[in-house]
Amino acid sequence: QPKSTPTLTVFPPSTEELQGNKATLVCLISDFYPSDVEVAWKANGAPISQGVDTANPTKQGNKYIASSFLRLTAEQWRSRNSFTCQVTHEGNTVEKSLSPAECV
């Protein structure tokens, strides 16, 4: 089966969650093959490892899908300019960023 590079989608925290002073970012990693992926998160370009929870890839058709969560406080979310989900797959790196300012 040919290799397939992952597609990334990053979802911002919900308004309800922010009202509760929490912020969870979700990075959806889809349509990749083979199943081996490495996920890293960055805040303002600096690696962030605390609060990261990555689920194991699951098969969807003949490709794989996975998700990674970054749990923050609302304050941490608001105080950074950008958050990036970075995925390394078969030696290639794909990243998708999200800016809190765009998610008001």
Swiss-Prot record:
It comes from the Eukaryota. The keyword Disulfide bond applies. SUPFAM superfamilies: Immunoglobulin (SSF48726). Gene3D superfamilies: Immunoglobulins. The keyword Endoplasmic reticulum does not apply. Signal peptide: none annotated. GO terms for cellular component: IgG immunoglobulin complex. Keywords: Disulfide bond, Immunoglobulin domain. GO terms for biological process: immunoglobulin mediated immune response. PANTHER family: IG-LIKE DOMAIN-CONTAINING PROTEIN (PTHR19944:SF98), MHC CLASS II-RELATED (PTHR19944). This is Ig lambda-2 chain C region. It comes from Rattus norvegicus (Rat).
